[in-house]
């Protein structure tokens, strides 16, 4: 199904939230035995990296269509060493047909960047792409995709009970959302540190199903 790629209007205009940044989640990755790994290939830009406070330990975001960047958790879980320039093989099924052996495909990329781990640290982190390529490279995968929008709270919104804030936002949005309680409800942080990481206080996935065609 092809639907709007725009973020949810009620969230984009919400009094508590800053404008969103987007990650495209596209390809379910398989291991060498064609078992699902639970990790996703997608694409995001510098704006997402900045708002998500993602840290590149080595290298850079993909600039060319044969490049890929991954976080350490995804990289090591798939059995790679983690060296810049390493060849990464992405195994996937066209149109997400996981039970159709004839749909199995492989594409190779060169590792250009390694992020500090986030897929196993963020709650629901594995719903975000643990491996990213350029949008153009992503467009050749014949798979269903969705847009994930990451929102941050405005600096004026300060409270010790972010769960209540989230519930109010969820009521207003009426869309699929996720609450990262592993971060939001962690009380021992000083207030200054909480505000420094305000980017992750409200992480909302606004789903827009789209299909990339070859």
Model-based region annotation:
Residues 1-191:
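Basic-flanked hydrophobic alpha-helices used for secretion and membrane insertion
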Residues 189-214:
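Hydrophobic alpha-helical transmembrane segments of multi-pass inner-membrane transport and secretion
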């Amino acid at each position: 199904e092809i639907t709007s790629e725009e973020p949810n209007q009620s969230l984009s205009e919400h009094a508590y939230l800053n404008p969103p940044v987007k990650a495209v989640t596209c390809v379910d990755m398989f291991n060498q035995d064609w078992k699902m790994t639970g990790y996703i290939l997608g694409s995001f830009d510098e704006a997402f990296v900045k708002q998500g406070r993602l840290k590149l330990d080595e290298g850079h975001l993909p600039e060319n269509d044969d490049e890929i960047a991954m976080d350490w958790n995804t990289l090591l879980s798939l059995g790679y060493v983690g060296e810049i320039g390493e060849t990464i093989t992405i195994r996937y099924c066209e149109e997400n047909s996981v039970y159709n052996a004839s749909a199995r495909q492989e594409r190779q990329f060169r590792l250009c960047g390694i992020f500090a781990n986030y897929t196993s640290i963020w709650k629901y982190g594995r719903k975000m792409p643990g491996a990213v390529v350029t949008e153009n490279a992503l467009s050749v995968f014949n798979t269903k995709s969705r847009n994930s929008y990451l929102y941050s709270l405005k600096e004026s919104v300060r409270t010790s009970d972010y769960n209540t804030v989230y519930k109010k936002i969820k009521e207003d949005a009426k869309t699929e959302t996720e609450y990262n309680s592993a971060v939001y409800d962690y009380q021992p942080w000083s207030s200054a540190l909480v505000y420094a990481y305000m980017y992750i206080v409200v992480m909302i996935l606004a789903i827009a199903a789209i299909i990339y065609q070859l």
